[in-house]
């Protein structure tokens, strides 16, 4: 099995996992997954955590191998603890906090792969799973699983209910720290810190894509003389040229037109992840594509957690080719791009001792306001979730920040594979010309595009303008107008209600039935047609005259066709010549009338 978790540019070929002197069962699990060499962040963090027992603060982007950088030390130390105290009855020794339920499930899957040969000694439980009822969760917690994975809010709820005991905790991991803070978990983290055991017996990992003032506050709250690791992504990114980025300047209605042409003619090969900026947009696009027989499935914060999890799993198994994901990133504030974290010059990973780090008085600085998310705040799709083998990321709606753009396009061209991203940009002069297809965030598209181009240029990447031959597309416009007209606001509302009913029903089945019958899960599909809008069947077929000449089928020459038709056939039916057939004149009532 090939290296799948980290991008090739992050691999440290000069090191190996054998140099860490891990437990044989853990080493065997790592080999069975397919990992031969650690990544740069792993080769730096694991020795510091295992040998020096240091707290770790790591800054590294998606695909750098952050998950194994903290999981390997956690599992190894728990195994050592079990060997030293064989009479131990079991207790919660490690807690991993993540911002979203999707990421919690993803971390659980990695843990299960790592403990496959020592599952009798280490148990792991995802507290944020939507598949487990409250009573079942309480019964599972009585078994004292060694590792717990949860969102901060879920852990606080269980601590308040005294269902979880962390008095003997040895490890605390906060993954995607910057996203945890963005989602408004600061108060929950404070409550958790008040219940932790003494810092001398606790080892902490803070993993983040950025290091800002908020993380400095968490460092003082949770860490004790941490080692700070900074991965210089700029050096790594220089060798990553397998992601090709395009942008298309297009009107609001023409977004739907281009989507129809792209997917109906199969211009993109492989799986596509489409991002929209709100839930209504996702359903509108799905219903419009349904008009033309193009199947897709929806992923948004309204759906039940276990349905979202199942959709991601099925998408990764290639059950669906087209996934429309709602990315509510309006609450992520754009940071000043000039105040990027300092670049490292000596090597790709810089280890900074906490004693040498000086910080300014943070009290004088005003904290940036966080916008409360009304939908499920434990939902996140553009960041952290591992979508596998995505050929194309299509930004149907341009994100509202350059930072969000980076997270979106990071879903493709992963683990050394190639990929493309296409972003639709609405020029300011085109904004508001077509009210039904309008979205307010498009007013700032050109401004955001400028920021994105500037940011990508710093990383050595280029956004290329992609010019569609509008003459080739114009022939499809009248069909799109017919299809778009059928998708009204009422139809969208009905679609949302119908989808929620279907998914809630499926959610209950997932909780009760599918735990005992996992094979039945294959029959549950999320890309079924909703049909709340009037579907015109003729739109599903594209006539040859609309296709470009290169895409038309070769019409075989029919040859000579005589002017006179075969008299033996009439209106498609064979007519016998013999006397069984009466003359037409005798059957004419006007001629036979007397």
Curated annotation (Swiss-Prot):
Keywords: ATP-binding, Helicase, Hydrolase, Nucleotide-binding, Nucleus, Ribosome biogenesis, RNA-binding, rRNA processing. It is an enzyme of class 3 (hydrolase). Disulfide bonds: none annotated. Residues 562-594 are annotated as: Disordered. ATP-binding RNA helicase involved in the biogenesis of 60S ribosomal subunits and is required for the normal formation of 25S and 5.8S rRNAs. Belongs to the DEAD box helicase family. DDX56/DBP9 subfamily. This is ATP-dependent RNA helicase DBP9. The lineage of its organism: Eukaryota, Fungi, Dikarya, Ascomycota, Saccharomycotina.
């Amino acid at each position: 099995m090939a290296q799948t978790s980290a991008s090739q540019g992050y691999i440290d070929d000069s090191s190996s996992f054998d140099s860490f002197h891990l437990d044989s069962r853990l080493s065997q699990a790592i080999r069975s997954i397919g990992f031969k060499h650690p990544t740069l962040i792993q080769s730096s963090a694991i020795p510091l955590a295992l040998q020096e027992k240091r707290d770790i603060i790591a800054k590294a982007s998606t695909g750098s191998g952050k998950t194994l950088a903290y999981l390997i030390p956690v599992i190894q130390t728990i195994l050592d603890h079990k060997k030293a105290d064989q009479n131990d009855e079991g207790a919660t020794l490690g807690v991993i906090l993540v911002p979203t339920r999707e990421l919690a499930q993803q971390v659980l899957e990695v843990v299960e792969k790592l403990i496959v040969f020592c599952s009798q000694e280490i148990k792991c439980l995802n507290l944020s799973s939507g598949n487990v009822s409250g009573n079942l969760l309480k019964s599972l917690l009585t078994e004292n699983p060694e590792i717990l994975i949860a969102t901060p809010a879920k852990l606080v709820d269980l601590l308040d209910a005294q269902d979880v005991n962390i008095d003997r905790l040895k490890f605390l991991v906060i993954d995607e720290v910057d996203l945890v803070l963005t989602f408004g978990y600061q108060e929950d983290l404070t409550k958790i810190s008040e219940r932790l055991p003494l810092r001398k017996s606790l080892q902490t990992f803070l993993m983040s894509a950025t290091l800002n003032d908020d993380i400095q506050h968490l460092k003082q709250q949770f860490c004790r003389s941490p080692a700070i690791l900074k991965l210089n992504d700029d050096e790594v990114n220089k060798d990553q040229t397998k992601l090709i980025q395009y942008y298309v300047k297009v009107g609001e209605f023409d977004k739907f037109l281009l989507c129809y042409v792209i997917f109906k003619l199969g211009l993109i090969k492989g799986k596509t992840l489409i991002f929209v900026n709100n839930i209504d947009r996702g359903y509108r696009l799905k219903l419009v594509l349904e008009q033309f027989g193009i199947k897709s499935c929806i992923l948004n914060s309204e759906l039940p957690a276990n349905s979202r999890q199942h959709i991601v799993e099925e998408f990764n198994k290639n059950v669906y080719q087209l996934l429309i994901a709602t990315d509510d990133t309006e609450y992520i504030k754009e940071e000043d791009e000039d105040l990027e974290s300092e670049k490292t010059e000596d090597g790709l990973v810089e280890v900074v001792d906490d004693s040498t780090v000086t910080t300014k008085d943070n009290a004088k600085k005003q904290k940036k306001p966080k916008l409360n998310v009304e939908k499920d705040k434990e939902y996140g799709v553009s960041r952290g979730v591992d979508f596998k083998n995505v050929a194309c990321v299509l930004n149907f709606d341009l994100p509202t920040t350059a930072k969000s753009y980076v997270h979106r396009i990071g879903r493709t061209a992963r683990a050394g594979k190639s990929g493309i991203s296409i972003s639709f940009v609405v020029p300011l002069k085109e904004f508001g010309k077509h009210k039904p297809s309008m979205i307010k965030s498009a007013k700032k598209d050109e401004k955001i595009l400028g920021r994105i181009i500037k940011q990508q240029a710093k990383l050595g990447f280029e956004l290329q303008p992609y010019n569609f031959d509008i003459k080739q597309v114009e022939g499809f416009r009248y069909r799109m107008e017919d299809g778009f007209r059928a998708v009204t606001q009422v139809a969208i509302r009905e679609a949302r209600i119908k989808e929620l009913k279907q998914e809630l029903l499926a959610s209950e089945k997932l909780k009760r039935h599918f735990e005992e019958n996992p094979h039945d899960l294959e029959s549950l599909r999320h890309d079924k047609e909703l049909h709340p809008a009037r579907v015109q069947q003729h739109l599903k077929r594209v006539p040859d005259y609309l296709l470009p000449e290169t895409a038309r089928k070769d019409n075989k020459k029919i040859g000579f066709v005589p002017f006179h038709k075969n008299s033996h056939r009439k209106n498609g039916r064979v007519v016998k010549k013999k006397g069984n057939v009466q003359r037409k004149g005798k059957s004419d009532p006007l001629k036979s009338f007397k």
